[in-house]
Amino acid sequence: MDKKLLEILVCPLCKGKLLFKKQELICKFDRLAFPVRDDIPVMLEQEARLIPLEEKDKL
């Protein structure tokens, strides 16, 4: 993922900073993981995966 793009992208819900990990953009605050498909972030809430509490602690 392009570092410049990662610097300007934020969570669409809380506007918090995102972490790029394993083809997902992760918002620790909302516990959501947004998929990145073909280097294009899919920043739709309905496409996001809810991160279980156990997994969030490992981020």
UniProtKB/Swiss-Prot annotation:
It comes from the Bacteria. One of its GO terms (cellular component) is cytosol. Coiled coil: none annotated. InterPro entries: Trm112-like. Pfam families: Trm112p (PF03966). Belongs to the UPF0434 family. This is UPF0434 protein lpg1920. It comes from Legionella pneumophila subsp. pneumophila (strain Philadelphia 1 / ATCC 33152 / DSM 7513).
